[in-house]
Amino acid sequence: MNDKITVCLGKGGQREMAESFARKNNVPIMDKPGEHLTVMFDSRGVSLTGYGLTYQGDFEGMLHRVTNGRLPHEMLVRAVKTEGEHLKAIDATAGMGEDGFLLAAYGYEVTLYEQNPVIAALLKDALRRARKHPILKDIASRMKLVEGDSVSCMEKLMDPVDVIYLDPMFPKRQKSGLINKKLQLIQKLEPPCSEEKDLFDAAIKAGPSRIIVKRPLKSVCLDGREPSYILKGKAIRYDCYVM
């Protein structure tokens, strides 16, 4: 892990959780935030602080996207084009889980893979709080986090899956003036190790009905493979592969 990361146990924080994270990732526990990035465990949950910024995962801010008839208009929901019962999806590049949340809101049982331990800790805490929310709890109950390398996880996959979603875009590609607080902090973490081609190959071998890949609008297709169909937005597009 990034050697500039520390753990801080604040007032009301869960000591056992903080100690487990610190031990697992070989980072020190401090009584105050470090000079660079700090994973803070306090009464509010888990947050990432540093460089004058603080970020905590929160699905409550996405309620407006999944209520009042807005969900069917989401590009990702339109891209999956699958209907039925007991549908299963894998978000192989979970990040903070926003896209997985949209799929879960649409009815999918979603498994989220995240290999960065800091991001996984933030996402785990966001899911914990969402499962206590009167509206979010139903959606969050369909989301399961798996911490680990996505390629390895997909190679070990035994159960059939309907959709595998890939978002290999990494925040550092964006100009610093255009990125929000979350990305400013997350881009300071170590980038993911898995190459785009390795992710795509593992997704294909897993045998889903569809693979959905999020791409910058003007970028080339992942690994040069032409999609079955494309959904375009103003800044991004979804390349959709029917298997």
Give the positions of each predicted feature.
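Conserved SAM-binding loop of SAM-dependent methyltransferases across substrates and taxa
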Residues: 96-108
